[in-house]
Swiss-Prot record:
Record organism: Haemophilus phage HP1 (strain HP1c1)
Keyword field contains Manganese: no
A biological process from GO: virion attachment to host cell
UniProt-recorded name of the protein: Probable tail fiber protein
Keyword entries, A-Z: Host-virus interaction, Late protein, Viral attachment to host cell, Viral tail fiber protein, Viral tail protein, Virion, Virus entry into host cell
Cell location: Virion
Primary localisation category: virion
GO cellular component labels: virus tail, fiber
Pfam families, A to Z: Collar, Phage_fiber_2, Phage_tail_fib
Protein function: Probable tail fiber that mediates the attachment to the host cell.
């Protein structure tokens, strides 16, 4: 059998712990997985397939063991079945997340059917992890429902057996039950019937046939009362031909062996059963003449004459002085003897027991209790009693005892105390009613996990390099290398025994910081804040506009960034340092709506003059004022058709309605007719003074012969306006930006901390935000000259780039607290600046900012590979002159000198002189 927790469980608990959420497991699954065994369970740490799952059931009960341990229980009733399973899993059903997988030998689950009792199964899973009670929200104590009735049921069975034992003794057989008879040759039969052996009832329904291969022998019944797989109890009987004592088999079941008969070498059977003297015998009428009669059951009877060796019929006698061994005493003889005994008793009581020290010979039976007020002493013989080899028994209101003495010296005493405790020589004897307590009764308890044989988990104080801690456990490091930062840390290591999947979780002592990293078998990853990778680099996230500088983000405004400062973002954007511009606004766009209710953020176009102010809609106000100089100059759309700008038309220009220039002509006469007669049909037109005509008398020869009706004449056609076919909708303008309440930011980096006073990532982000802010302020300042604007921007950008470049190149390669000796840094320093952070006291810390003196050395690139050794580097600080007492003569100079020796490998540094200072950290740039 094997059980494992899953990686999903560990992540789930960690996530809920960080989020202060709730850990929930609500269902058990039972599956039958082919080939599953305890050695390959690690290959099955996912929820089995639906074809393999044979049963699913909600958690029946859950309870608390202690603050860090909870137990989940499920009971499958007898109405469920039939199926086999070898896998049990505890899951979170909504998340489809497997927490614990258990491999077990194949178990059969049988339900009730056809009057055959099924089996019920209870399975419990205990989960232990930090804060389990608080995380799961379970408050019920497991003691209220984790009850095992096995002992109780077994006790009931044992009580019934002991009751039968009290009634029937060791064994009793009724009538011919289990009577052994010879059939022929070595073939024998055992007759059916009932019997009791040590209180266990034996039932033989039919005649049993037995072969005795070797004679002589004896026949024994071997009986055991035990439970079947369904919980049903049955009695099993087998027959032996060799003697065997009562025994307990490999299944821890008690067997009782009772002799039935002896068979001699000729096959003759001697009945050895213990027959009941009063149970099961059918009463028959017998007298002194009964002999060789056969009853209806086939029994034959021959009454023997009673003797001192054999039961039978006998004569009676009233004599009190007879020594006959063939006659029985009558009541009269007994009465006479009784009277004499009373007389003797009276005499004896006056003589025996008054002074004690009498010796009473022979076996005596006492019908009532024996009470000894000074205890009771028992010895095997008078000789042993005289030698004070005694077993003394006694009791009082506090306890009872059995004491063994040898030569009047106490060897040992067993006591039963009034509170139920047992002891031997005043040392407790533990039992089911008085179990030992771990804290008070067990001595010499180990105080380490190793003391309990647990070698794959450690709890200890550590030191040195954190990279070396790969064994599961909890460690405390006051200082060391490769910690997340300076200070004291608690390191939790989780690996499950794997060497290529090691997780370290670091919690800073007396702080809330939590960082984590992993080891893949070759390298350690960088330390990161726990839960800090929720938003991937490059993700676009919206924040309320009130959030002006979220840590880890750059505003998505189309600007560029320094790729050395944000290398991860640069790679994510496809090797580009251009941020997306998501500052676009939709204010000022127009749209038609087919409803009367205008959506939020829009206003009717013709309400601009009355509703748009700098306070209400500042962005739209600015756009319109920039275009039309004043809100009152914004044209009204009214009932106009909207045209596109171009072809001489400008935005905001309005036009009256108009029809392209054209004429309609009506013929009035034929100017080219030879008779020059006027052609005018009064039936087709009207005679009206408003009908203008052009005749041959005017100068415009091309329109001669036509007339032009006026608009107010009946000949005018059309409506009140010129228009195409139309659909009337509501023209509106966007007055408020859709994303007016939010700003878009790009995830640029996780929390990147440099030990010391600077946070490079946040500083770079703040510098970029400062640049944008200043640019905005300059833009708003209409009185600043273009030269001032450009100079200010250039100055800020230059400083920003200098800070970015400087910070991006600094890297910590060692941390510690030494003033002499050798230091090994984590990276070669050839061609770089070596920066040592010094303090005058060993107890000072860099994060105290107390008396920090940085010293830097330039390590030339030409040193790498140099033959003959490394290079000696020195620096001189604080040259102090010393004058004579009168101050007239300079007699010396005090110099603070710092010197180191860099080895040819570029990573070994020998401290030569630090002027009694201590180096706390080394950076390279």
């Amino acid at each position: 059998m094997a059980s494992l927790i899953t990686p999903q469980f560990e992540r789930y608990v960690a996530e809920q712990t960080i989020a202060r959420g709730t850990v929930q497991f609500d269902e058990f699954i039972f599956a039958n997985i082919p080939g599953l065994n305890e050695n390959n369970l690690t290959q099955h740490l996912t929820i089995p397939t639906s074809a393999q799952i044979v049963h699913r059931q909600a958690v029946s009960q859950s309870g608390v063991i202690n603050e860090n341990a909870v137990v989940y229980s499920v009971t499958i009733g007898t109405e469920v079945g039939d199926f086999d399973f070898n896998f049990i899993g505890l899951i979170n059903r909504s998340k489809n997340l497997l927490a614990v997988a258990v491999q077990t030998d194949t178990v059969k689950k049988i339900r009730n059917k056809n009057a055959v009792q099924g089996n019920s199964i209870t399975r419990n899973m205990l989960l232990e992890f930090s804060g389990a009670k608080a995380l799961t929200g379970i408050n019920v104590n497991a003691n209220t429902w984790q009850i095992d009735f096995t002992v109780r049921l077994h006790g009931l069975d044992e009580k019934i057996r002991l009751t039968n034992r009290d009634l029937y003794g060791r064994a009793v057989f009724f009538d011919d039950s289990f009577l052994v008879k010879r059939k022929t040759g070595n073939q024998f039969t055992i007759q059916p019937g009932n019997a009791y052996v040590e209180g266990v009832r034996m039932d033989l329904g039919t005649e049993h046939h037995l072969t005795a291969n070797s004679l002589p022998c004896s026949i024994y019944a071997d009986v055991v009362h035990h439970c079947t797989v369904t919980g049903e109890y049955q009695t099993e009987i087998k027959y032996l031909t060799q003697s065997k004592a009562d025994y307990v088999d490999t299944a821890n079941r008690q067997h009782y062996v009772q002799i039935l008969a002896d068979i001699d070498s000729q096959g003759n059977v001697t009945d050895r059963r213990l027959l009941s003297p009063f149970w099961g015998m059918n009463p028959l009428t017998l007298d002194d003449t009964t002999e060789n009669t056969k009853d209806k059951l086939g029994h034959t009877h021959k009454l023997p004459i009673a003797s001192i060796k054999k039961r039978g019929i006998t004569k009676l006698s009233s004599a009190t002085n007879s020594d006959s061994e063939t006659q029985a005493a009558t009541s009269k003889a007994v009465k006479t003897a009784y009277d004499k005994a009373v007389e003797v008793k009276t005499t004896a009581e006056s003589k025996v027991g008054l002074r004690g020290n009498e010796s009473i010979q022979g076996t005596k039976s006492f019908e009532s209790k024996i009470i000894g007020f000074r205890g009771i002493g028992v010895a095997d013989s008078q000789t042993y009693a005289n030698a004070n080899h005694l077993l003394n028994m006694g009791a009082n209101d506090g306890d009872g005892w059995i004491e063994y003495k040898k030569s009047n010296r106490v060897i040992g005493t067993i006591r039963i105390r009034a509170n139920g405790e047992l002891s031997y020589n005043n040392q407790k004897i533990y039992h089911a009613g008085a179990k030992p307590q771990f804290n008070t009764d067990i001595e010499g308890k180990p105080n380490t996990l190793a003391g309990y044989g647990i070698g794959n988990f450690k709890v200890e104080q550590g030191q040195g390099d954190a990279n070396g801690y790969k064994t599961d456990g909890n460690y405390y490091l006051a200082s060391g290398q490769n910690l997340p930062e300076n200070g004291e840390w608690h390191i939790e290591v989780v690996s499950g025994g794997a060497t290529n999947a090691v997780r370290q979780i670091a919690r800073k002592a007396n702080d809330n910081k939590i960082k984590t990293r992993f080891f893949n078998g070759s390298n350690w990853s960088e330390w990161k804040d726990a839960g800090g990778d929720g938003v991937p680099i490059g993700s676009v996230v919206s924040f309320p506009r009130a959030v002006t500088n979220p840590v880890g983000f750059l505003k998505a405004n189309g600007t560029t960034f320094n790729q050395q400062t944000f290398p991860d973002l640069y790679r994510t954007l496809g090797d580009s340092n251009q941020l997306p511009d998501l500052t676009r606004s939709d204010v000022g766009m127009t749209a038609y709506f087919a409803v009367d209710n205008i959506p939020s953020g829009w206003i009717a176009f013709d309400s601009i003059r009355s509703t748009v102010t700098q306070q209400n809609y500042p962005e739209l106000y600015q756009y319109l004022v920039d275009k039309y100089s004043s809100i009152s100059n914004v044209p009204l759309a009214e009932d106009r058709f909207i045209r596109n700008t171009g072809n001489g038309l400008n935005i905001g220009q309005t036009q009256s309605d108009e029809i392209k220039k054209h004429v309609h002509r009506v013929r009035t006469h034929w100017a080219d007719s030879s008779d020059s007669s006027i052609f005018y049909d009064k039936t087709k037109t009207v005679i009206d003074s408003r009908l203008r005509t052009a005749t041959t008398t005017d100068d415009n020869l091309s329109d001669n012969g036509f007339m032009h009706p006026l608009l107010d004449t009946p000949m005018a056609t059309g409506g009140d306006e010129t228009r195409p076919k139309s659909l009337i909708l509501k023209l509106c303008i966007k007055a408020k930006n859709t994303f007016d309440d939010v700003q878009f930011w790009v995830k640029a980096f996780g929390v990147v901390e440099n030990v010391g006073a600077l946070d490079a990532g946040t500083l770079a982000q703040n510098m970029q935000a400062l640049s944008e802010s200043v640019g905005q302020k300059i833009k708003e300042n209409k009185q600043s000259t273009l030269l001032e604007i450009n100079n200010a921007k250039a100055d800020i950008n230059q400083k920003f780039l200098q800070v970015q470049e400087s910070l991006s190149q600094i890297k910590t390669v060692w941390q510690g607290n030494v003033s002499s000796g050798r230091i090994n840094i984590s990276e070669k320093c050839f061609g770089k600046t070596l920066i040592l952070y010094l303090q005058s006291s060993e107890s000072h810390r860099l994060d105290d900012n107390n008396n920090i003196e940085p010293v830097s050395f330039e390590v030339g690139a030409e040193i790498e590979g140099k033959s003959g050794g490394g290079v000696y580097l020195s620096a001189t600080h604080d040259v102090t002159p010393h004058y004579s007492s009168g101050g007239s003569r300079l007699y010396g100079v005090g110099v603070k000198k710092f010197a180191v020796y860099v080895g040819r490998d570029g990573t070994t540094i020998e401290i030569e002189d630090l002027s009694n200072y201590f180096v706390k950290r080394i950076d390279i740039r």
